[in-house]
Amino acid sequence: MRRKIPIILGLAFLVFMVQTCKHNPEEGLLKRYFHAVSLNDLTTMSTMALEPVDLEVKSWEITSVSEEEIKPASLPELNKKELELKKKLEDHVGVTLDARDTLDEAEFELENARTRAARNAAQAKVNELQAKYDEIFEEHKELQRQYNEAKAAAAREEEITLFSLGERELLNVRDLTGDIHSKEVDVKIVSKEGEEKTYRFYLRRYNLRDEALGLDHRGRWVIVRSEPVG
């Protein structure tokens, strides 16, 4: 019986450590991250943080951790929005060019008008078509802006997804469904000069599934970004 006691205690300690790591992933991640910071090891920092920040750190301490938020993976919808706006933009190119051509023809007629009446009529036509073209062109610029934003948002989300999954590329990554886990962690950092500053670290982990192939992709906790908050 005495021999079994150390084994039981050892197993209990192991279970405790596993549960601690499971429920407090930020502690282990940030411990490894700040160890790399202390060594000025940018390569290792870059394996844990998308945007590693070079900090002068004497000591650090976690001061608060938000509740873990879980929400559906957003990349499929972001990709859908990007493709829809791309189609709208491409379709609108023809409309914009047609309006420009019509305006150019009217301006040509104005240049070649010989009588005052003809010039007045041509000028009125140009004014009308110019206003119409300006409106269409503004619509085109707005579509271009929306498309650029949607494209950037989808690309950013894809980058974070791949980083959490530990993949350089995944052909169908934009089709994967599942959950995004996120936390915000505030850390008090004391610099080597003794100055205190609080940084907020934004952490995420992706648990996704390829429904077509029936494969699960379990991501790791990573630092998406950090910023000073006080």
Feature annotation, model-predicted:
Residues 1-19:
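Sec-dependent bacterial lipoprotein signal peptides
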Residues 25-41, 45:
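Short, aromatic-enriched amphipathic alpha-helices that serve as compact interaction elements
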Residues 52-71:
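Short, charge-rich amphipathic alpha-helical segments embedded
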Residues 87-230:
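Exposed beta-sheet edge and beta->alpha loop/turn motif
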